[in-house]
Amino acid sequence: MSQPITRENFDEWMIPVYAPAPFIPVRGEGSRLWDQQGKEYIDFSGGIAVNALGHAHPELREALNEQASKFWHTGNGYTNEPVLRLAKKLIDATFADRVFFCNSGAEANEAALKLARKFAHDRYGSHKSGIVAFKNAFHGRTLFTVSAGGQPAYSQDFAPLPPDIRHAAYNDINSASALIDDATCAVIVEPIQGEGGVVPASNAFLQGLRELCDRHNALLIFDEVQTGVGRTGELYAYMHYGVTPDLLTTAKALGGGFPVGALLATKECASVMTVGTHGTTYGGNPLASAVAGKVLDLINTPEMLNGVKQRHDWFVERLNSINHHYSLFSEVRGLGLLIGCVLNADYAGQAKQISQEAVKAGVMVLIAGGNVVRFAPALNVSEEEVTTGLDRFSAACEHFVSRGSS
């Protein structure tokens, strides 16, 4: 008989880069999870905006099982039917002409930054290497992407960092304009800063970045790892804003829980990449591609995308009602089903404590820094699941407030 697994085993066996919850989920269905003891949780965290169709969606399981019965992997010396079908679906649904597949958002952003540097060097010379990113951004954990992310806490232990990366203030076009010049090869920006606090960009800000990039022959990269694949109520957030990037990165929800990432590019941008300039062993494998293709089929419909907007209203209305009772939040913000509750000054820095109370009450939420409680539920979360989950969240807020005042 195999050894029983406990949460303590994590501390014994794993490199301690995470601090997971005190329970271990063992089964999921829709927006519900159950742990080893059988306790039920409503999942409003969505695996950090990954499980866009909930847990164990029957059509995703069918797509995975069907491909798994054929073959799993060949390497990049061969292509496969599922990846080509997936590429065509993304091209047909977006501005892109070409796609590069990888395994994660960090890999997609790494590929985008490398492409942007090569594009600028080939077209304008090696002096054009500057990258402008934004404070409080998050683009991944590779050395290049963690340097582009404007959060020193994630990069300060790994110096020397890649050079020629500067950070402007988010949503401040004057700050960006002061840094973007003819030596800039790319600007990388999240349409909504997710890890940075669920902060949506303004239309004027993104439009201003588009104009600055055009003026200085720089590529505009939208990091849509968290905002993409229906999260905002559009297939990609750039469609909400009406500002088209040159490159777009996507991952998380694209696989519905199966690891996959992609870089979307125009034909002109993609033309600088040739055999051997970049690559990945697993990217675009048939298992991931089969699942992601089904994810797009299910999400990229008017019914699903309009449903995201409706569910946004359910969440915001109820969260504002909860806040009316407990006066925890200064603001409820976000687009679609990426929602942040900003703690007011009386509770600054205590988002983690609220998330811990939520877990005790049977609902899973995220944080985005110390001051924001973040919701990124499945896009198909039911009205009953929303009601039950927010009832539990309300109870958690009540307990948090009463504990603090006792």
Swiss-Prot record:
Name of a matching Pfam family: Aminotran_3
Cofactor dependence: pyridoxal 5'-phosphate
Entry GO MF terms: identical protein binding; pyridoxal phosphate binding; succinylornithine transaminase activity
InterPro entries per record: Ac/SucOrn_transaminase_bac, AcOrn/SuccOrn_fam, Aminotrans_3, Aminotrans_3_PPA_site, Class-III_PLP-dep_AT, PyrdxlP-dep_Trfase, PyrdxlP-dep_Trfase_major, PyrdxlP-dep_Trfase_small
The EC number(s) this enzyme carries: 2.6.1.81
Catalytic activity as recorded in UniProt: N(2)-succinyl-L-ornithine + 2-oxoglutarate = N-succinyl-L-glutamate 5-semialdehyde + L-glutamate
GO terms, biological process: alpha-amino acid biosynthetic process; arginine catabolic process to glutamate; arginine catabolic process to succinate; ornithine catabolic process
UniProt superkingdom: Bacteria
Keywords of this entry: Aminotransferase, Arginine metabolism, Pyridoxal phosphate, Transferase
Modified residues (N6-(pyridoxal phosphate)lysine): K252
First-tier enzyme category under EC: transferase
Pathway(s) served: Amino-acid degradation; L-arginine degradation via AST pathway; L-glutamate and succinate from L-arginine: step 3/5
Stated role: Catalyzes the transamination of N(2)-succinylornithine and alpha-ketoglutarate into N(2)-succinylglutamate semialdehyde and glutamate. Can also act as an acetylornithine aminotransferase.
Family indicated by similarity: Belongs to the class-III pyridoxal-phosphate-dependent aminotransferase family. AstC subfamily.
Descriptive protein name: Succinylornithine transaminase
Species of origin: Escherichia coli O127:H6 (strain E2348/69 / EPEC)
